[in-house]
């Protein structure tokens, strides 16, 4: 579908486009939670990794902690993608049309959090128990290669409202950027191999 249902915002030339994104490749999640040294989960994770001699149980606990720390999740929303991630995805796609600056000025996702459909009642701890939702892969850290554990959603979708200032950019350019973002850019970690999506305009 390519026709957008655009609602005018009274008093200016802002319009909203409601879209549904459906994954065409798996979504690999990796939040920046561990970047906060004051987060209790960060402190607990450092205690686990700080042990000099680690047992198999220690390695499992570290993997689980890393997985949970990589989740974008809260009790109110469930699992979600931050709206700023979709903003960045759209700007990257807009640069293909040489419209990156205009999109920064005139296009923004309305919501703060974009819930992943079907995971509202699932906690990170529960998700960890399903091997289909656990991605384990080797990554390079300096000269060493270590295993990283992240949440993966193999079938996923989410909805968003994209606000457009028509004084800056037109709707057709935004719709093209949305489609390009899904096919060429993607969301989440290891994009565009992961996180690609199809766009449906409501």
Locations of regions flagged by a protein language model:
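RNA-interacting cores
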Residues: 1-202
């Amino acid at each position: 579908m390519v026709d957008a249902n655009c609602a005018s915002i009274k008093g200016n030339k802002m319009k909203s486009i409601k879209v549904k994104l459906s994954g065409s490749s798996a979504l690999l999640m990796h939040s920046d939670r561990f970047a906060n040294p004051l987060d209790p989960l960060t402190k607990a994770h450092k205690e686990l990794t700080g042990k000099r001699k680690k047992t198999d149980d220690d390695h499992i606990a570290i993997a689980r902690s890393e997985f949970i720390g990589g989740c974008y999740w809260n009790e109110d929303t469930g699992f979600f993608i931050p709206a700023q991630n979709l903003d960045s995805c759209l700007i990257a796609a807009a640069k293909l049309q040489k419209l990156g600056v205009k999109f920064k000025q005139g296009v923004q996702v309305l919501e703060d959090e974009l819930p992943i459909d079907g995971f509202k009642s699932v906690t990170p701890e529960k998700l960890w128990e399903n091997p289909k939702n656990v991605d384990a892969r080797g990554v390079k850290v300096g000269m060493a290669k270590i295993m990283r554990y992240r949440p993966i959603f193999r079938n996923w979708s989410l909805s968003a409202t994209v606000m457009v200032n028509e004084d800056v950019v037109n709707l057709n350019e935004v719709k093209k950027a949305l489609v390009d973002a899904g096919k060429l850019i993607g969301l989440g970690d290891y994009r565009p191999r992961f996180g690609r999506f199809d766009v449906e305009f409501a």
